[in-house]
């Protein structure tokens, strides 16, 4: 499974090349202008933390390159409603088709079924995808430091800001985190999964915490599978979590959320 990320990014560049011809930027912008304002993604996370609760970005994910199909019975609208009832702060929905068996339609269905803000979880390589994300209804986008240079991330953060969207910037090591912190977004994701090997270690978040200045919200991502994992993070003042697989493997993902974070 060597360098999955490079394979994914190559496909993404091809998707953007084709997509931006089929739907030119002017067309996507017009679609965006017809939409209501985005839901407040950062505000939803801050409200949970202010109340003393864990802020959970609950992920809707059918499959992954490392695990294959995770959930056969995959109904995004139903899962979104279960997550909302389970106490999620926000949703994350995979829209990548080739590697994660996601789709924009899944994001649209999930968002329509609930009142939670929704992150488009995909591999963004071009500002066109930020407009595309808003056009499909996303309230936030993910920017991955391992996939982008700083100038590109700043451009995409500016586009997201102009559309009223939040940005979650994701890093995996100290060098990436130093780049991530040059963006203005308050949401700093630390991915415990190495996107080049897909190996997971919760120590990644703990090792990087001290580098994150006050005022930023650390979102720990990947590998949160048991209440002990949650307790470890909260004992270290990490109160925001992006969790998918642990919930996708139980019949009612909302109940899974409650049992993991209750």
UniProtKB/Swiss-Prot annotation:
Superkingdom assignment: Bacteria
Q: Does the keyword Amino-acid biosynthesis apply?
A: yes
Q: What class of enzyme is it?
A: lyase
User: What are the GO MF terms of this UniProt record?
Assistant: indole-3-glycerol-phosphate synthase activity; phosphoribosylanthranilate isomerase activity
The pathway to which it is assigned is: Amino-acid biosynthesis; L-tryptophan biosynthesis; L-tryptophan from chorismate: step 4/5
User: Entry's InterPro entries?
Assistant: Aldolase_TIM, Indole-3-glycerol_P_synth, Indole-3-glycerol_P_synth_dom, Indole-3-GlycerolPSynthase_CS, RibuloseP-bd_barrel
The Enzyme Commission number assigned here is 4.1.1.48
Q: Describe the family membership recorded for this protein in Swiss-Prot or TrEMBL.
A: Belongs to the TrpC family.
Q: Output this protein's name.
A: Indole-3-glycerol phosphate synthase
Q: Which organism is it from?
A: Aromatoleum aromaticum (strain DSM 19018 / LMG 30748 / EbN1) (Azoarcus sp. (strain EbN1))
């Amino acid at each position: 499974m060597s360098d999955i990320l490079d394979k994914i990014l190559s496909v993404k560049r091809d998707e953007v090349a084709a997509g931006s011809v089929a739907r030119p930027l002017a067309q996507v912008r017009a679609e965006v202008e017809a939409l209501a304002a985005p839901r407040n993604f950062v505000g939803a996370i801050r409200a949970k933390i202010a109340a003393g609760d864990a802020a959970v970005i609950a992920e809707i994910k059918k499959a992954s390159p490392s695990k294959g199909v995770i959930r056969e019975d995959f109904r995004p609208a139903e899962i979104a409603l279960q997550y909302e009832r389970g106490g999620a702060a926000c949703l994350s929905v995979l829209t990548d088709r080739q590697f994660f068996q996601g789709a924009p339609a899944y994001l649209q269905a999930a968002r329509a079924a609930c009142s939670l803000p929704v992150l488009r979880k995909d591999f963004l390589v071009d500002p066109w995808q930020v407009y595309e994300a808003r056009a499909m209804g996303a309230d936030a986008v993910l920017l991955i430091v391992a996939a982008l240079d700083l100038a590109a991330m700043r451009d995409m953060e500016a586009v997201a800001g102009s559309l009223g969207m939040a940005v979650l910037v994701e890093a995996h090591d100290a060098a990436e985190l130093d780049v991530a912190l040059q963006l203005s977004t308050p949401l700093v994701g630390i991915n415990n999964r190495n996107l080049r090997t897909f190996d997971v270690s919760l120590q990644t978040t703990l090792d990087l915490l001290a580098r994150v200045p006050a005022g930023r919200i650390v979102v720990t991502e990947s590998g949160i599978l048991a209440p002990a994992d949650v307790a470890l993070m909260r004992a270290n003042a990490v109160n925001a979590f992006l969790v998918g697989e642990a919930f996708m493997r139980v019949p009612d993902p909302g109940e899974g959320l409650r049992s993991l974070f209750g």
